[in-house]
Amino acid sequence: MEIKYVKGDATSPIIVEGKKSVIVHCVNTLGAWGKGFVVPLGQKYPQSRKIYNHFIQLHKKGYYTSLLGLICIAPNVSKDIDVVNLFGQERIYPIMKDGEIIIPLDYIALRKGFETIVDSYASEYSYKPVPITVHMPRIGCGLAGGDWNKVEKEKTYYTDERF
């Protein structure tokens, strides 16, 4: 899979004829949707927030022991555009513990989420290359304080192998 880095608005993916655009972003498990990339995303595609809230409610009712690493897809939020909410962090901001900064981003959860995204779309299409384009901000590297080099490594491992 060829990776192109484009500066711009990740809520407005570049549409490629014959391919579905998939916007992937990282969400927390708290039910807090109100800072960072989710603000413009939720304004443009309210279905993405609605399905996120649905998963939060299911978690609170005990349907999931943990949301970390899970994804929830808001399909067809616009013509040929899906939004994938990837549960990759438990908190919103880094904290200080015993003199060490602990970030809320969980790289293992990201890895699991990327793998699930790849499996979901690869199984939807029985041929390769899978006709999707993936669009995402530097997930987990804003408020959550993650390291883009580590996130990129996880993302590339799964996408390069499958698409």
How should each PLM-predicted stretch be described?
Residues 1-163:
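Macrodomain-like recognition of ADP-ribose-binding/processing modules
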